[in-house]
Amino acid sequence: MNKGELVDLLATKADTTKKVANTLLDAFIDSVTAAVADGEKVTLVGFGSFEARERKAREGRNPKTGDKMDIPATVVPAFSPGKMFKDAVSGR
Protein backbone atom coordinates (compact mmCIF):
# COMPACT_ATOMS: atom_id res chain seq x y z
CA MET A 1 0.00 0.00 0.00
CA ASN A 2 1.35 3.40 -0.94
CA LYS A 3 0.48 6.81 0.50
CA GLY A 4 -2.30 7.46 -2.03
CA GLU A 5 -3.99 4.16 -1.22
CA LEU A 6 -3.67 4.87 2.51
CA VAL A 7 -5.24 8.31 2.03
CA ASP A 8 -8.15 6.69 0.14
CA LEU A 9 -8.66 4.16 2.95
CA LEU A 10 -8.48 6.84 5.67
CA ALA A 11 -10.98 9.02 3.81
CA THR A 12 -13.40 6.10 3.51
CA LYS A 13 -13.04 4.94 7.14
CA ALA A 14 -13.27 8.49 8.56
CA ASP A 15 -16.09 9.44 6.18
CA THR A 16 -14.23 12.52 4.97
CA THR A 17 -12.66 13.82 1.79
CA LYS A 18 -9.35 12.65 0.39
CA LYS A 19 -8.01 16.18 0.77
CA VAL A 20 -8.76 16.23 4.51
CA ALA A 21 -7.39 12.70 4.96
CA ASN A 22 -4.19 13.67 3.12
CA THR A 23 -3.79 16.80 5.27
CA LEU A 24 -4.25 14.77 8.46
CA LEU A 25 -1.79 12.08 7.35
CA ASP A 26 0.80 14.73 6.44
CA ALA A 27 0.28 16.43 9.83
CA PHE A 28 0.70 13.08 11.61
CA ILE A 29 3.91 12.26 9.73
CA ASP A 30 5.32 15.77 10.29
CA SER A 31 4.46 15.67 14.01
CA VAL A 32 6.00 12.24 14.62
CA THR A 33 9.09 13.17 12.59
CA ALA A 34 9.61 16.43 14.50
CA ALA A 35 9.10 14.79 17.90
CA VAL A 36 11.52 11.93 17.18
CA ALA A 37 14.07 14.37 15.72
CA ASP A 38 13.85 16.31 19.01
CA GLY A 39 14.64 13.13 20.96
CA GLU A 40 11.10 12.38 22.10
CA LYS A 41 9.51 8.94 22.06
CA VAL A 42 6.07 8.83 20.42
CA THR A 43 3.93 5.99 21.77
CA LEU A 44 0.59 4.95 20.29
CA VAL A 45 -0.71 2.38 22.78
CA GLY A 46 -1.38 -0.93 21.07
CA PHE A 47 0.15 0.18 17.77
CA GLY A 48 3.76 0.90 18.64
CA SER A 49 6.45 3.44 19.44
CA PHE A 50 8.63 5.68 17.32
CA GLU A 51 11.97 6.80 18.75
CA ALA A 52 15.52 7.77 17.88
CA ARG A 53 18.16 5.15 18.68
CA GLU A 54 21.88 5.66 18.87
CA ARG A 55 24.17 3.31 16.98
CA LYS A 56 27.64 3.02 18.45
CA ALA A 57 30.78 3.64 16.42
CA ARG A 58 32.26 0.43 15.10
CA GLU A 59 34.88 -0.96 12.82
CA GLY A 60 33.82 -2.26 9.42
CA ARG A 61 35.40 -3.35 6.19
CA ASN A 62 35.29 -1.93 2.71
CA PRO A 63 33.62 -4.73 0.70
CA LYS A 64 35.68 -3.96 -2.42
CA THR A 65 39.13 -3.78 -0.88
CA GLY A 66 38.72 -5.52 2.46
CA ASP A 67 40.41 -2.56 4.19
CA LYS A 68 39.33 -1.80 7.75
CA MET A 69 37.42 1.44 8.22
CA ASP A 70 35.82 3.24 11.13
CA ILE A 71 32.06 3.65 10.97
CA PRO A 72 31.02 6.65 13.12
CA ALA A 73 28.24 6.65 15.71
CA THR A 74 24.91 7.79 14.36
CA VAL A 75 21.30 8.29 15.40
CA VAL A 76 18.60 6.41 13.46
CA PRO A 77 14.80 6.37 13.63
CA ALA A 78 13.25 3.16 14.97
CA PHE A 79 9.76 1.67 15.31
CA SER A 80 8.80 -0.92 17.91
CA PRO A 81 5.43 -2.57 17.23
CA GLY A 82 2.91 -2.81 20.07
CA LYS A 83 1.17 -5.98 21.22
CA MET A 84 -2.14 -5.39 19.39
CA PHE A 85 -0.28 -4.66 16.13
CA LYS A 86 1.92 -7.77 16.49
CA ASP A 87 -1.10 -9.93 17.31
CA ALA A 88 -3.06 -8.61 14.30
CA VAL A 89 -0.17 -9.32 11.94
CA SER A 90 0.45 -12.81 13.33
CA GLY A 91 -3.26 -13.67 13.11
CA ARG A 92 -3.91 -14.11 16.83
Identify the function of each model-found stretch.
Residues M1-R92:
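Strongly charged
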